[in-house]
Regions:
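Cation-handling catalytic/transport regions enriched in His/Asp/Glu
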Residues: 1-201
Length: 201
């Protein structure tokens, strides 16, 4: 850790992350452990297992009331969920959809997964592999978070400040996911199936 007070400081330096932020994150995660353990115990019981393994985390514990969500329906959910971010933000989401910023469906030779790539001279591009399910709705919200982050950064910042670390990048995408989850919780209301399905996320 030459030139640094610690190996931790050295590792955080390139992302411009203060050690206090790192320690706050660790503390917050540790604080959430009891709720996480309760959730895992509930999942284990719901699946009727003596021991829960990593692969069990992907097994649905309830019927899926969200199966068959088309891309168009997914976008409507995302529009509504992200409305708190303001009119300009939502209008840019419309542009992204209408102006071909997004490659939506699987195709031969297309890379799997989902990605967003911002460019300094034009709008961002988003690659999806939409599957008509709730996970794809969250993926759409997540990748649009990256795309909008790049769009605003490129528009508002001089070139030297346009880039950002992965630590910062994931804030915009995770905020979008949190807003989507909050919106879905509100919409589910007393619908037990929709409420219970959150256990699968």
């Amino acid at each position: 850790a030459r030139g640094y007070k610690s190996c931790l400081e050295m590792c955080l330096f390139s992302g411009d992350i203060p050690e206090s932020v790192y320690h706050s994150l660790i503390e917050a995660v540790h604080g959430a452990f009891p709720a996480f353990y309760d959730y895992m115990a509930l999942r284990r019981r719901a699946l009727g297992l003596e021991q829960l393994h990593m692969y069990d985390l992907y097994v649905p514990v309830t019927e899926n009331p969200y199966q068959g969500i088309t891309y168009e329906q997914a976008f409507e959910l995302v529009f509504k969920a992200l409305a708190p971010l303001g009119e300009e933000y939502v209008s840019l989401l419309h542009r992204a959809r209408d102006e071909g910023w997004i490659d939506v469906y699987e195709n031969q030779g297309k890379r799997s997964g989902a990605y967003s790539n911002g460019t300094p001279t034009c709008h961002p591009f988003v690659l999806l592999n939409h599957q008509d399910n709730l996970e794809s709705v969250f993926t759409l919200a997540h990748e649009l978070g990256h795309a909008m982050h790049s769009y605003f950064s490129n528009r508002e910042q001089p070139p030297i400040y346009r880039g950002y670390s992965i630590f910062v990048a994931e804030v915009a995408s995770t905020v979008n996911e949190a807003l989507l989850l909050r919106y879905l919780e509100k919409e589910a209301g007393q619908d037990r199936k929709k409420g219970a399905y959150r256990c699968n996320l």
